[in-house]
């Protein structure tokens, strides 16, 4: 969608043949990213691998793109619509009493519609309903929703009174149904965003408390039968296709001092680098 939206929002007029070529170019970008993440290119994928991964494969994505262009072109070319940014990073304050605490992330899309500012958030699901096309539990999952509420906080901080809502641009991923799309508008009252702020700051306190406990344990952690810091949330182990580290939890009571097992790589994850926060003029604390 990052490649598609700027093209569709341009003032150029496209023939059906040109729109088809745009979809092909977008799927080429998708396929390149697909390969970069360790999967087989759509051009080289055999039937066994395709059946194993279906419906989340490039071929289905291409069919969806054709339908998506037809479904969204009218809105994106409307004179009421203006695309402002694609994947912009953001950093907004979380606590007026702590100038070092920021909520950071990236927004899928930011656009102006009829004078108001919206965040566009792309979501896919396989939760198909014959007369839907989406199941009710998927449609209801965005309010309340910590991620969406966080984006609402961010857009209000960035754009003030012009900020309006998050539009969840939902797409059904299905083997044969390729035209399942819906825009789910999410607005929240300021009191509800304030509740999200309190929840978030509470979780920040929890993480910082655990970090302090871990720091105090120090090198003694290697000799303990379990790690008395950062408690597990075992009710979430199977969410989003399953936690990739669940096998390590089954293997060890305490991961400290263990050799990195085959198939895993130990590396530093930096949200600063991942989100490209340097674009905002920010500096990574590790460089100071």
Annotate the PLM regions.
Residues 2-87, 93:
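A non-catalytic, helix-rich entry segment at domain boundaries
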Residues 20, 24, 83-85, 116-121, ...:
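Short, well-ordered strand-loop elements centered on a beta-strand within folded domains, enriched
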Residues 18-26, 49-57, 81-83, 102, ...:
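Glycine-rich, flexible loop segments associated with nucleotide phosphate handling
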Residues 81, 85-152, 156:
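Non-catalytic protein-protein interaction segments used by genome-maintenance enzymes to assemble
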Residues 75, 98-99, 232:
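Residues embedded in well-ordered secondary-structure elements
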Residues 140-143, 150-288:
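Metal-dependent nuclease catalytic regions and adjoining charged, substrate-binding loops involved
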Residues 1-12, 134, 140, 157:
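An N-terminal domain-start capping segment
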Residues 14-16, 95-100, 114-116, 159-162, ...:
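Short, solvent-exposed loop/turn segments that connect beta-strands within catalytic domains
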């Amino acid at each position: 969608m990052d490649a598609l939206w700027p093209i569709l929002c341009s003032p150029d007029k496209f023939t059906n043949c040109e729109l088809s070529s745009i979809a092909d170019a977008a799927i080429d970008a998708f396929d390149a990213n697909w390969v970069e993440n360790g999967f087989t290119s759509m051009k080289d994928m055999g039937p066994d691998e395709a059946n194993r991964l279906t419906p989340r494969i490039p071929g289905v994505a291409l069919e969806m793109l054709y339908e998506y262009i037809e479904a969204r072109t009218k809105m994106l070319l409307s004179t009421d619509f203006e695309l402002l940014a694609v994947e912009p990073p953001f950093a907004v304050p979380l606590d007026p009493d702590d100038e070092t605490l920021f909520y950071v992330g990236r927004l899928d899309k930011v656009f102006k519609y009829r004078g108001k500012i919206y965040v566009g958030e792309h979501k896919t699901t396989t939760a198909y309903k014959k007369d839907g096309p989406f199941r009710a539990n998927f449609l209801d999952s965005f309010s309340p929703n910590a991620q969406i509420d966080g984006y609402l906080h961010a857009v209000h901080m960035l754009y003030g009174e012009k900020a309006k809502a998050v539009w969840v641009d939902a797409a059904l991923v299905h083997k044969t149904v390729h035209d399942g799309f819906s825009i789910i508008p999410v607005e929240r009252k300021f009191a509800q965003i304030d509740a999200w702020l309190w929840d978030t700051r509470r979780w920040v306190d929890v993480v910082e408390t655990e970090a302090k406990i871990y720091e105090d344990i120090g090198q003694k952690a290697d000799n303990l039968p379990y790690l008395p810091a950062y408690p597990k949330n075992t009710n979430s182990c199977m969410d989003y296709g399953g936690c990739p580290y669940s096998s390590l939890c089954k293997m060890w009571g305490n991961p400290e001092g263990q050799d990195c097992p085959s198939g895993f790589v130990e590396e530093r994850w930096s949200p600063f680098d991942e989100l490209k926060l340097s674009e905002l003029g920010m500096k990574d604390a590790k460089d100071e």
